[in-house]
C-alpha cells in the first residue's frame, strides 16, 4: 500500500533528524502532493522500514505506473530526488547547524555532521557507492588505490533519447554552480533539491563547500567559487588552498591543473577537491632534499613519486605562497629540450601545476606537481599522458585524484575483466578473443607469460594487481621528469633555475 511507503519515508526523515515531530503531518502532505495523491490511509500498525533505496523504489514505481513519472533511469532519479527534497531542510537551517557545530565543537565535528547529512538526504546515494569496486595494489611508490566507478549512473537508451529532445538551458551554467542548490533538474541536468552547500571565505573571496555525490574517497568534498569563472592556477590559488586547510586542518585540498589534457573534466568553473583521506603521494617520502635560496626556512624536496612533485613545508603559510608562486612562474616559462619540455609551441602554453595543500604536524604543506600538455603525432593525446598501450585500461585525463594515487577507472572494465578472467583461465588464444577484449590481447599474453600459475582460484587477484601496475605505468607516463638519471638531472636543473 502506497500510504505505508509514504509513512516509511516520513519515519526515515524523523529517524535521521532531517525532520522533527512537529513537521510530520506537513511533510506527509507535501509527499502526497509530490506523488499527486489526494488520500492517505494511516497504517494500522507501527511502520518499520528496511532501507531507503527500497522505499524510494516503491514510491517511484507507483508514480511510473500512474503516469506521474516517465519510465527511464534519468526520470526516476529526478523524481526520487524531488521526494527527498521534501525532507531536506532549507539552506539557512543547514548553514546555521554547520556554523553552530564549527564554533562550539570544532571543524571536524562540523564536517562529520555535514557529511552524514549529505548521505541522509540521499544526495550521496550510499547504496550506489557500495557498488564501486575498490582495491589496493602494492607498488614501488607505495599502495595505490584502484576503483572501478559503478555509482555514477549510466543513462539507459530511453534516457539518452529523451535528453537529446530536451530543450537546452544555460541555467545553471554548469553542475558546480551555486545555483544548483534546490534545482529540480531536467533530462540533461541532475536534480539537486536535496543538495545543500556551505558558504566559505577564502582569500577574501566567496566560495562554497559541498560533497561529491560520487565519493571517490572518504569525505570527498568539492570547494567551488561562488562565481562561474574558469580554472586558473596562480598565486591566489595557493593562498586559497592554504586558507582552506587553515579552516579545516583535518582535510587536504587540491586543485586540478588549468590546461586541457592535464586538467580535470571541468575547466569552466574554478574549484578544488579535498577530503579526509591520505593518498599514496601524501605518504611518499622525500627523495632529494632541496634548499631554495632566500627560503632556507622552508623545508623542500623532490618526492619519491612517478609524477614530478616538489614538496614544501613551513609553519608560515605566507612563505609557502611566496615560494610556490616563484616555482609556478619559473615553470610557466621553462623549457628543456633534452627532457622534451617546451613552455609553449605556436603561442600555446604547455606548463602548469597541480597543487595540493594539507597540514602536517602543525605546519602547512604544499605539494606542487609539474605538468605539461604538449602533444605530438606519436602521442596525439599528450606526451605526458597515458601512452596508447595503456589506453585499454586508462585513456582519460590524469587529474588531481589520479595524480595523488587513486585510479578512477571506467565501469566497462568490470564486464571486460570478468570476460578476460574466463579467457585467461581457459587459455583461449588471443586471436579468438571477442572484439571488446581485443584491446587487452597483448596485455593478456604478457600476464600469462609472467603468471603460468594462473587458475580459476587466483585469476581475479592477479588481474586486480596487474591493473594496479598498469596505473603505476600511467603515472610514470604522466610524469614530466622520469625516475632515471636523465630525468633526475633535468628536475635538478629546473629547481636550480628558480630564483
Predicted segments with their positions:
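Active-site microenvironments that recognize anionic phosphate/pyrophosphate groups
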Residues: 1-223, 227-230, 304-306, 320-324, ...
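Short alpha-helical interface elements
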Residues: 171, 266-270, 278, 294-297, ...
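Helical scaffold of the NTase/Pol beta-like nucleotidyltransferase catalytic core
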Residues: 194-198, 226-253
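Hydrophobic faces of well-ordered beta-strands that scaffold small-molecule active sites
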Residues: 209, 253, 270-272
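Histidine-centered divalent-metal-coordination microenvironment in nucleic-acid enzymes
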Residues: 219-225, 263-279, 369
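Catalytic or ion-translocation cores adjacent to nucleophile or general acid/base/metal-coordination motifs
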Residues: 236, 245, 249-265, 274-328, ...
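Beta-rich nucleic-acid/ligand-interaction surfaces
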Residues: 260-268, 346-352
